[in-house]
Swiss-Prot record:
InterPro entries in the record: Cycloisomerase_2, Haem_d1_sf, Lactonase_7-beta_prop, WD40/YVTN_repeat-like_dom_sf
Family: Belongs to the cycloisomerase 2 family.
Comp. bias intervals (Basic and acidic residues): 104-126
GO cellular component labels: cytosol; nucleus
Pfam families for this protein: Lactonase (PF10282)
Domain of life: Eukaryota
Protein name according to UniProt: Uncharacterized protein C18E5.01
Source organism (scientific name): Schizosaccharomyces pombe (strain 972 / ATCC 24843)
GO molecular function: 6-phosphogluconolactonase activity
Region named Disordered: 102-129
SUPFAM superfamilies (alphabetical): C-terminal (heme d1) domain of cytochrome cd1-nitrite reductase
Amino acid sequence: MKLVIGTCTDGPVLVFDMETKSITEKLEGVSSPTWVEWEKKSKRLYVANEIEEGYVAVFEWDNGKFSLVDRFTIDGHSPTSLCVLENGSVLTANYNSASISRSKAKDEKPHVWHHEGKSLHPERQTSSHPHQVTAHKHLVCSVDLGLDRFSIFDAEDTSSDPVVVVNVPAGYGPRHIVFHKTLPVCYLICELANRILVYDTNTFECLQDVSTLPPSMTLEKDPKFPQPPSAAEVAVVHDGPFLVASNRYLNHGQCDSLWAARLDPVTGKVIEGTEMQIMLHGICPRHFMFNRGASLLAVAMQDDDLVHVYRREPKSMCLHLLFTIPAPKPTCVKFLEDEDLA
């Protein structure tokens, strides 16, 4: 098993071997490779390069190693996320150009959707800031932190306008969304409000609005530590089932946490009273990922220059730190199972 690590540095992308516990490859030809995505069918790793003139680098797995096989511009600035559709199209969320791009290869001119508007926050929401684009079944979803909304597209016709636009409360600053694998439910984590909104994906009615912060904590700024708490990533663990999210900049920068709660297996809603805070060994968990069986968890601790790898006990959120991986400003982690690479 491999663990791929993206960073907000000049590169490279790091490939860590989970068996030998060592960095086995450093993938060059990237700049600020903050997001990575694996496409299993083609055995290709797609890397979003979060620089002003953003681009995507593509690495192919062959004969036990990665090789750079493609690199194309996206006609957008600072892509923070990407997804690969079944037809080979690559979608990127371009944070600093208020746009979503669709590209296919270096010889194809990107198709770009531009967004306009603003919302409540005087610094973070003066314009559109798409933060994520992701695919689920026949849907493509883009999440816009600056406009306080997310949009749903038909994956078969991403050249058209969105089929659904969902507005969230002003000032919430939505960041990432994750869809339940078997239930018609999705979970939207909001960076600025430190809250998760639960939606019915048939109607996109909001079912719940849940805080990820400890009960005693507020969003008021501390003059000694001006960085306010900000939520980052969200995921579903299906053997609980649990909903898990990461909190950044708690406790005056001393120690951050994962928030977790049990989900109702029938409705997919958060079960009130099951919320827990799991303290981590560091600060700024910008991204995390469970492996396919959810027995392992990797957490990118951006401000500590470390990735933490935990063992998770079955059907619980009890975590045991196994080891740490030095990595400069890690921003994204991606497990690649042996069967993915075979």
